[in-house]
């Protein structure tokens, strides 16, 4: 496999490279810079005498970054391309931003105030996880192969159990306890892979999404095909774009149930933004717009506002989390129903993306694969009084079907 695929341009002929040594190149030089155990010196790279077994992978980083260790005792002091000894090093990618050089991890959103580039994953339950990366460039995601999974995915609810859950939510609606609940289930399968990079490569090819993201750091491995924006920040301006309403591709118009569901969440998100934005600044510039995505269509709205002075990142996450579209309305009551009926969602239905200074792009962490002891994927549907239980089950299948087909296995 070409270790530079997706980062470097086509490589020249490498007859001088000995067997078992992967080629590492400089685009500017257009020539080999590594030969087995030879001392390596170029204008951009000084690795000293590095054993060849450590020279396996290459990733681009900003020139003049100093001092990232590639293995014990060996350091780059001035480089354009960094040689790494493992393809399992922390990495983050979203919308063309490739971040490497993991230097710090934190569970405190106050860390975001330092102005550095932080990849962020929050859980539905409110846990905050962030990894700081020192090197950020514009680059495509490094392509990695994926061997498709075999076997059958297990679901936290089978069809009859999920339908019973939907009916229970409808009872809560009838009692006036909630107006809407996003009822979810988790599917999982045993898998033995080092990471999900190869799966994310397939996602980018087979299910491109506006907020697709890959985040790998200690304790985190998430491959996302999220279609939904949780929060975009540019200075004082913030925007959220909740999705409520899903239908098969080719659907021309959504019914009243989907439209009512969307408007409920728009109202909820207006209230959430109102807690951190200046009075009178919250607006809805787009309402009930149809967006086309691979295999389905969504109903989307935009809510915008201007942040109050001195608003911190900790306040933003506290006031807005979890996202309204994947909890329900009223949010506190919906969360109570979810906790009573579902297991822990974890990274699914949290927030996922990056923060740097007063800028951010955070997606709603839906359509994500995440890995711990198993490979997991969440899917759900918004339940209102007008919900037809069998239709809601089919919606969860629709959301999972295309992506699971990329990963492999039987849904």
Protein language model regions, located:
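N-terminal, intrinsically disordered charge-dense segments
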Residues: 1-20, 25, 32, 62-79
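Extracellular interaction modules
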Residues: 45-55, 126
């Amino acid at each position: 496999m070409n270790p530079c695929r997706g980062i470097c341009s086509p490589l020249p002929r490498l007859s001088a490279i000995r067997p078992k040594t992967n080629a590492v190149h400089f685009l500017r030089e257009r020539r080999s810079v590594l030969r087995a155990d030879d001392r390596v010196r170029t204008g951009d790279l000084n690795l000293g005498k590095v054993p060849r077994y450590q020279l396996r992978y290459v990733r681009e980083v900003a020139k003049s970054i100093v001092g990232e260790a590639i293995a014990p005792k060996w350091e780059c002091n001035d480089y354009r391309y960094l040689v790494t000894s493992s393809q399992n090093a922390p990495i983050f990618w979203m919308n063309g931003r490739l971040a490497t050089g993991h230097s710090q991890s934190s569970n405190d959103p106050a860390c975001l105030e330092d102005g550095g580039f932080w990849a962020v994953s929050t859980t539905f339950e409110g846990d905050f996880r962030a990894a700081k990366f020192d090197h950020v460039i514009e680059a495509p995601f490094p392509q990695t192969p994926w061997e498709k999974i075999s076997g059958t995915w297990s679901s936290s609810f089978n069809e009859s159990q999920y339908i019973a859950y939907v009916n229970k939510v409808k009872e809560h609606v009838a009692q006036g306890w909630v107006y809407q609940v996003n009822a979810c289930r988790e599917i999982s399968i045993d898998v033995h892979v080092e990471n999900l990079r190869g799966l994310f490569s397939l996602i980018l090819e087979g299910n491109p999404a506006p907020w697709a993201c890959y985040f790998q750091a200690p304790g985190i491995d998430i491959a996302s095909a999220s279609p939904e924006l949780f929060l975009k920040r540019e200075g004082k301006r913030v925007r959220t774009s909740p999705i409520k309403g899903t239908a098969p591709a080719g659907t021309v118009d959504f019914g009243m149930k989907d439209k009512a569901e969307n408007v409920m969440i728009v109202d909820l998100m207006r209230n959430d933004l109102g807690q951190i934005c200046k009075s009178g600044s919250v607006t809805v510039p787009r309402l009930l717009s149809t967006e086309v995505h691979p295999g389905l269509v969504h109903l989307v709205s935009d809510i915008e506002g201007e942040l109050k002075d001195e608003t911190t990142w900790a306040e933003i996450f506290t006031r807005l989390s979890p996202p309204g579209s994947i909890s329900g309305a009223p949010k506190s009551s919906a969360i109570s129903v979810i906790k009573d009926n579902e297991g822990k969602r974890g990274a699914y239905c949290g927030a996922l993306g990056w923060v740097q200074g007063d800028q951010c792009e955070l997606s709603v962490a839906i359509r994500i694969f995440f890995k711990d002891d198993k490979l997991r994927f969440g899917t759900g549907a918004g339940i209102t009084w007008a919900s037809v239980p069998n239709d809601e089950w089919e919606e969860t299948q629709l959301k999972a079907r295309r992506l699971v087909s990329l990963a492999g296995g039987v849904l």
